[in-house]
Amino acid sequence: MALPRSAVSAEALAVVTNRLNGNGLRQDLRLIAALIEPHTRVLDVGCADGALLAHLARTKGVDARGIELSPTGVHECVSQGLAVVQGDGDTDLAIYPDDSFDYVILSQTIQAMRQPHLVLENMLRIGRFGIVSFTNYAYWRARWYLLRRGRMPMARCLPDPWYSTANIHPCTLEDFEHLCTELGLRIEQRSCLSADGTPSRLASSRWLDNLFSEQAVFVLSRPARRPADRRSGRAAARPARPLPAPAAPPHRPAPDPS
């Protein structure tokens, strides 16, 4: 179930798009679905109406489970027979044991998390792979909108005004990769997409990816951990600092025998 380290090519993404076209999924969800191996354990954090989970359960026979904050979304999922519970990805991932899933998915949700770094750590604690998709705030149209109008950008992939958007932690591709480096997470794959989910045709380097990609899908994994480093709900324990040597007792002169 190992994934290639290199980014998916535009040609490969086009094949995925054509093969999955017409299944009712968003394009980024179609790409995510293509990354999932059959008969694996999958958790979708912020699964909305359960479209991705239903597709994976139907076409790949996965053990599909989800967490959704919205009662309406939970009702839609349960009405389809999906194993979805109402919960908050910011806090409820901590209750899952280590290595509970093969894949943990966070699609267009990380920007709405209160503590994205802790969510990523927990994703890679409970899952073998983490798959994250998000909107790129460094896209050139967003930069131009802010420069020209002096207002928070709005575009196809950023449809809501600043005061009503759920995106409280917007980020760029460079921001996300930097965070992964800080957390010690391994980027197995990176796919750069336009707003409609098709491959970004102008992206050919990290700098161009950050400028011309409206959204991206990352596949993450964690470095191998020693059993002694596993802490449920926490990152790997850091080495303890050595304690300072005790101070020598003050010198006292011997008593005068006379």
Show the residue positions of the predicted features:
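Conserved alpha-helix/loop element of class I SAM-dependent methyltransferases that forms part
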Residues: 23-39
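S-adenosyl-L-methionine-dependent methyltransferase catalytic module, highlighting the catalytic core
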Residues: 117-122, 129-226, 232-242
